[in-house]
C-alpha cells in the first residue's frame, strides 16, 4: 500500500482518485501532480512501483501544502482575523456566516440547533 503525506492510499482505486484522499489535493491538483511526475492517471495504485510512488511523494512535498501544514495555515489565518478584530474575525468568533449570507432565516448549519422560545403555554 502506498503511503504519501501520512495517508495510506486505497489499493484498488485509480491513482488520480486515490490522491484526493490526501487533505488539500482535489482532482485538478492530482492530475497536475501526475502530469509533473509522468505517471499515467488511469493506472491503479496497486500497479505503481516504488520509484513512481517516490516521485509522487517528492512532487507533493516540494510543491504542495497538504495535510497538517495546510490545516495549521488555515487555522492560523482564521486566528489572525479574530486577533485583529476585523468583521470576518468577529463573524468567526460568533460562529455566524462569514461571507455575507442572510441570518434572519437559514444559516442553521453555522448557528447550530434552534433554541426554543420560552413562552406562556395556553
Curated annotation (Swiss-Prot):
This is Small ribosomal subunit protein uS13. NCBIfam families: uS13_bact (TIGR03631). One of its GO terms (cellular component) is cytosol. Keywords: Ribonucleoprotein, Ribosomal protein, RNA-binding, rRNA-binding, tRNA-binding. Belongs to the universal ribosomal protein uS13 family. One of its GO terms (biological process) is translation. It comes from Nitratidesulfovibrio vulgaris (strain ATCC 29579 / DSM 644 / CCUG 34227 / NCIMB 8303 / VKM B-1760 / Hildenborough). The gene is rpsM. Residues 95-122 are annotated as: Disordered.
